[in-house]
Amino acid sequence: MAVLQASKVIKRLKAASALKDSAADRRQVLRQTTADEVRAAGQPYTSVYLYMLNGEELVLKAFSGRSPKHLSIEVGCGVCGTAVAEGKDQNVPDVAARDNYIACNRRTRSELVVLFRKNREIVGLIDIHSDVVDPFSKEEEAALKKVADALGDLL
């Protein structure tokens, strides 16, 4: 499995950022482009969900892959909510071993959650699912972190 090419995704995000005049349209295009481009990298990415923080709740704003089961998640709940509550990215090699895992799909075996920030404040996250146990290497995490950082800067 290949590592995501962060520079390629970031280049497409920058191009997408220039396409829309209104800030709301531009933000939505950036969110959807992120989900589509990350998933387009292929295996191990089964589904990619992009949540934005709204108070104490994460709200789904874009996805690519399987239809989402959760349109919102409370901070502190599940892998996504834990990432925000702890302020740390989460790499869960085997979701079956995680006590607070919230099942989105019965085929999902692993999950990687990468936070993104605006002015050092958490504003959202990229939630990646895989049907493979333990597919996300440190290099994969680092590549996704670059994409998340770029997204935070562009939003």
Task: Give a label for each model feature.
Residues 45, 53-106:
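Regulatory sensory and allosteric helical modules in signal-transduction proteins
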Residues 110-117:
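A short, aliphatic-rich beta-strand micro-motif
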